[in-house]
Amino acid sequence: MAFDKDAFLTALDSMSVMELNDLVKAIEEKFGVSAAAMAAPAAGGGAAAGGAAAEEKTEFNVVLAEAGSNKVAVIKAVREITGLGLKEAKDLVDGAPKNVKEGIAKADAEAAVKKLVEAGAKAELK
């Protein structure tokens, strides 16, 4: 019994979520594969550890280590960088060390660290 692609897609389209889940489990058992394992190589792009290291370097966190003596200027800088309100920015500065921004590009992260340092804070790029 052979299905053509259109008939197969039509059959899949008519299945409920539970039926699709059962189908995935049956395919995993029949062919000895795992749906989770198939997603991992696609995310890595075929590169080994070198690709993972390069991937980590594309996203950076800006960490406010210490507010310094000019807390008002640091709060203003945090508000400019994050878009937070006055109270939220003050709470972030008072709770240092804390992440100001997470998962941003290197250029943006360096600019944010520079702005915080110019305001009198101790900031780090991680």
Curated annotation (Swiss-Prot):
Against InterPro entries, the record matches this protein to: Ribosomal_bL12 (IPR000206), Ribosomal_bL12_C (IPR013823), Ribosomal_bL12_C/ClpS-like (IPR014719), Ribosomal_bL12_oligo (IPR008932), Ribosomal_bL12_oligo_N_sf (IPR036235)
Q: Name one Pfam family in it.
A: Ribosomal_L12
Q: What is the top-level taxon of the source organism?
A: Bacteria
Task: Give GO terms: molecular function aspect only.
Answer: mRNA binding; structural constituent of ribosome
Task: Tell me which SUPFAM superfamilies the record gives.
Answer: ClpS-like, Ribosomal protein L7/12, oligomerisation (N-terminal) domain
An example of a Gene Ontology cellular component annotation for this protein is: cytosolic large ribosomal subunit
Q: Give the protein family.
A: Belongs to the bacterial ribosomal protein bL12 family.
User: What function is annotated for this protein?
Assistant: Forms part of the ribosomal stalk which helps the ribosome interact with GTP-bound translation factors. Is thus essential for accurate translation.
Name the chain's protein.
Large ribosomal subunit protein bL12
**What organism does the record attribute this protein to?**
Paracidovorax citrulli (strain AAC00-1) (Acidovorax citrulli)
